[in-house]
Amino acid sequence: MRFCSRVGDRIASALLPALVTVLLASPACRVKEEAITGTFSDTFDRPELGPNWRDTGGGYRITDGQLVAGGAYNHPAWLRKRLPRDVSIELDATSRSPSGDIKIELFGDGESFDPDRGGYVSTGYMLIFGGWNNSLSVICRNNEHDEGRKAARSDRRVEPGRSYHWSITRKGGAIDWKIDGAPFLAWTDPDPLIGSGHEYLAVNDWEAEVRFDNLVIRPAP
């Protein structure tokens, strides 16, 4: 019996580090980032992305005081701050490519990405201006395709090199998106994405070079 006890102790000792690693990696044990309760802003006036952002694929850099994305292939750069449930977001965005494709994610999990350039399913909402070779703009819930598209328009194209000012609010399930002060797309989610796993913002990219600046996030009034 003493032999069995010693063997059991050795097995337990060998398995303990792995068990601890699994537990610490689980959502329940993960340390939550700071919540935005006032006004958060980022003008990107620095040489590197910095600790407030999680680059999941290396497709992001700071150039000329702007956050530049290119060839990220749906590896978002997640802001390490938790969004207010009702939120107001403003930012400036520019595509340098005729393919347009300016996009951000809202209320995602803060870490997910596309591992194989396959069909990307977001953990939050996707707002895409000039996607699919500058042919379609959408608000998506999770999936960018098919049933995931909740509001769409195809009558406006991204002009390469032009800076667009985005204003986005979510109150309850209602998402309202304006560009340069004019209504662009809106949709009300009957089952809003809220709580754990749905608290973060990201900028995202496929191939186009896209630049972001003057990000401001605050609780919606």
Language-model features, listed with the residues they occupy:
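Carbohydrate-binding surfaces in secreted/extracellular proteins
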Residues: 44, 91, 160-188
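Secretory/extracellular carbohydrate-interaction modules
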Residues: 73-139
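Beta-strand-rich interaction surfaces with strong enrichment in secreted/lumenal proteins
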Residues: 75-81, 152-157, 202
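N-terminal Sec signal peptide cleavage junction
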Residues: 27-29
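Short carbohydrate-recognition loop motifs
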Residues: 58-75
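Short, aromatic/His-centered strand-loop micro-motif at the edge of beta-sheets
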Residues: 143-165
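Extracellular carbohydrate-recognition regions
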Residues: 31-55
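Flexible glycan-contacting loops in extracellular carbohydrate-active proteins
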Residues: 188-213
